[in-house]
Curated annotation (Swiss-Prot):
It catalyses: RNA(n+1) + phosphate = RNA(n) + a ribonucleoside 5'-diphosphate. It comes from the Bacteria. It is found in: Cytoplasm. SMART domains: KH, S1. The gene is pnp. It holds the Pfam family PNPase. GO terms for cellular component: cytosol. The keyword Cytoplasm applies. Its main location: cytoplasm. This is Polyribonucleotide nucleotidyltransferase. It comes from Streptococcus agalactiae serotype III (strain NEM316). Involved in mRNA degradation. Catalyzes the phosphorolysis of single-stranded polyribonucleotides processively in the 3'- to 5'-direction. Its EC number is 2.7.7.8. Residues 625-693 form the S1 motif domain. It is an enzyme of class 2 (transferase).
């Protein structure tokens, strides 16, 4: 196929799609140019079905540093493992695409997005999401798309689609919404305590823009799309299915209705073992033994899936006996750990998270060096999910995509209420350790994080709580669930996480397993989540009503002063001479950023105060109208030079010494004498003029008697 080009204007920027020129051996490939961002997307599919019990979809988002004209860091000077941002973007693309493949699809699919050129004002992640959907749609891979995604900002009461970096900086909302032309199927958001009404409007505005992109994709697919390949879907033997349902469904239904998680798991596992043992014995010598046993396992999974959904939609009964809008028992504890800078333990039913706070000087902030300009990240929220939290053995090692994603969600939820750097000059790290899990552990980590911050004396603006909402839908009727547990998450249609304060929402995340949900469901889920959030906030308030007025004794003492940017070199000195001298004299640690924020760290408050005084004197400038207690340092015929402070001198002209005429400066002033002066002028060369007489009472004018005529 020869090169073909398609164009449209979207959100004020040119969107160009090129096909048929590069990566032609992939099942589908496109080059997407949006503004000056360029992304190559290639989609490939294995020829045979995999043997696993899940759909092996892999989505990658590869940031090439040359795209921003930068060298990679490190010794080898080449790209290594994906950055956190790249991992989160890959998840962002995966989530709306995954539901668009047929049930039982087991061929491996890889979608590789490579950022070739980066423009921070034209979203490369959204270009990659568009390219991923389009590459799959024009290929022969059986993909039930297209989908598309956009970013939405909220500035001065207006919604902006795919904002520039400057617009996003000013925005109260950072939202990514994706979906089909019929409905939304993925949401990721951070917000500055926005109302449910504004969030819902933002979602709908975003979906309108999504529909524009989908219409453009449909035009391209009509023009160049390939015929879809015939692939084998994982389907069970219907006769075997009917037989197992007839003989074992009642026993499995009873097991599913056991309320306590561990007891329920044991009961369902016992039923499954009986069924599997029966069929292993019957078909041990059968030539299709592996296929039959795979079908048996799949049928049992489908039966459990069907019973959980039936209970909720028909009987309005949840597996643990709760009402559809009922939260599991809650508990909140602070100061769980000694020595640390703050800690909180939050429990919701059989889900439990321990959050631990660590404070440090800004020199410990994380340096982010990606495609965007390098910056320091002050707040970090890390999430760990050990396998013992669900009573299982498993892999231990570096954080995976899921842990990185859950940590980022908690980070977005909590960073909206953190004090500014000027108010609280610390780098802040929260680590959430999931100790037990039966669903919604990411939201438990947010609640535990709030407890740890407040217990540690971080002056947050308001406590934040999170809740996970679920959905069971049969296409006609639906039920929205509050505080979903693991079974409801696994067999349900939606995982909709909402975090916020009493004033509004600070984070949203939604993933669904069906093709989309309606505005009505979104509105209902947000309303139920608000009610639940307030209930959880009451429990957090019971544990700690407000942030402690002081830090933990083990926390470092840090103070910060702001200096003019052009004074940074004065504090540092030639070759660091000045700052090294200050550190040697006071014993503190000092960190200065490029904006003039000076952080001073020590265990001794007196040393911090002494350092602040030294730096203040170094950067001090004379100001017109201010009064100084000065010392005479030089006398000339035309006036006296006085030292105001440090290396700043001023001239007191002979006419500014007194209101009466001064014949000789040396008659009224001597070197070393201390006098009060007022600055009256600073010229464009920085020379300072001061006055002594301006501080003295002006003598009355002498009366001039009138002459008699």
């Amino acid at each position: 196929m020869s090169k073909q080009v398609f164009e449209m204007i979207f959100a004020g920027k040119k969107l160009v799609v090129e096909t048929g020129q590069v990566a032609k051996q992939a099942n589908g490939s496109v080059v997407v140019r949006y503004g000056d961002s360029t992304v190559l997307t290639a989609a490939v599919m294995s020829k045979k079905m995999s043997t696993g019990d899940f759909f092996p979809l892999q989505v990658n988002y590869e940031e090439k540093m040359y795209a921003a004209g930068k060298f990679p860091g490190g010794f080898n000077k080449r790209e290594g493992r994906p950055s956190t941002d790249a991992t989160l973007t890959a998840r962002l693309i995966d989530r709306p695409i995954r539901p668009m493949f047929a049930e039982g699809f087991r061929n491996e699919v890889q979608v590789i997005n490579t950022v070739l050129s980066f423009d921070e004002n034209a979203s490369a992640p959204m270009a990659a999401m568009f390219g991923s959907s389009l590459a799959l749609s024009i290929s022969d891979i059986p993909f039930n798309g297209p989908i598309a995604g956009v970013q939405v900002a909220y500035v001065d009461g207006n919604f902006i689609i795919n904002p520039t970096a400057q617009e996003q900086e000013a925005s109260a909302l950072e939202l990514t919404v994706a979906g089909t032309k019929e409905a939304i199927n993925m949401v990721e958001s951070g917000a500055k305590e926005l109302s449910e009404e504004i969030m819902l409007e933002a979602l709908l505005k975003g979906h309108e823009a999504v529909c524009e992109l989908i219409a453009f994709q449909e035009e391209i697919v009509t023009a160049i799309g390939k015929e879809k390949a015939e692939v084998e879907l994982l389907q069970v033997d219907p006769e075997l299915q009917a037989e197992i349902i007839a003989t074992h469904n009642i026993a499995l239904q009873a097991a599913v209705q056991v309320e306590e998680k561990k007891a329920r798991e044991a009961a369902t596992e016992a039923v499954k073992e009986v069924v599997i043992g029966e069929y292993e014995a019957r078909y041990a010598e059968h030539e299709e033994y592996d296929r039959i046993m795979r079908d048996v396992a799949e049928i049992l999974e489908q039966m459990e899936h069907a019973e959980v959904r039936r209970l909720i939609t028909e009987d309005k009964v949840r597996p643990d006996g709760r009402r559809v809008d009922e939260i599991r028992p809650l508990d909140a504890v602070i100061d769980f750990l000694p020595q640390v800078h703050g800690s909180g333990l939050f429990t919701r039913g059989q889900t439990q998270a321990l959050s631990v706070l660590t404070l440090a000087p800004m020199g410990e902030a994380q340096i982010i060096d990606g495609l965007t300009p390098e910056y320091k990240k002050r707040f970090m929220h890390h999430y760990n999910f050990p396998q013992y939290s669900v009573g299982e053995t498993g892999r231990y090692g570096a954080a995976g995509r899921r842990e990185i994603g859950h940590g980022a969600l908690g980070e977005r939820a909590l960073e909206q209420v953190l004090p500014s750097l000027e108010e609280f000059p610390y780098a802040i790290r929260l680590v959430a350790e999931v100790l037990e899990s039966n669903g919604s552990s990411s939201q438990a980590s947010i609640c535990a994080g709030t407890l740890a911050l407040m217990a540690g004396g971080v002056p947050i603006k308001a406590p934040v709580a999170g809740i996970a909402m679920g959905l069971i839908s049969d296409g006609t009727n639906y039920t929205v669930l509050t505080d979903i547990q693991g079974l409801e998450d696994h067999f349900g249609d939606m995982d909709f996480k909402v975090a916020g304060t009493r004033e509004g929402i600070t984070a949203l995340q939604m993933d669904i397993k069906i093709e989309g949900i309606t505005p009505q469901i979104l509105e209902e889920a947000l309303a139920q989540a608000k009610k639940a959030r307030f209930e959880i906030l009451d429990v957090l308030h019971g544990a700690i009503a407000e942030p402690r007025p002081q830090l933990a004794p083990t926390a470092p003492k840090i103070d910060m002063i702001k200096i003019d940017v052009d004074k940074i070199k004065v504090v540092i000195g030639k070759g660091g001479e000045t700052i090294d001298k200050i550190i040697a004299e006071t014993g503190v640690k000092i960190d200065i950023d490029e904006e003039g924020n000076v952080s001073i760290f020590s265990s001794d408050q007196a040393a911090i105060d002494r350092t602040k005084d030294i730096i203040a004197s170094l950067v001090r400038e004379a100001k017109v109208g201010e009064v100084y207690h000065a010392k005479v340092v030089r006398i000339e015929k035309f006036g006296a030079f006085v030292n105001l402070f440090d290396k700043t001198d001023a001239l007191v002209h002979i006419s500014e010494i007194a209101w009466t005429r001064t014949a000789n400066v040396a008659d009224v002033l001597e070197i070393g004498e201390e006098v009060d002066v007022k600055v009256i002028k600073i010229d464009d060369k920085g020379r300072v003029d001061a006055s002594m007489k301006a501080l003295l009472p002006r003598p009355p004018k002498a009366d001039n008697p009138k002459k008699e005529s």
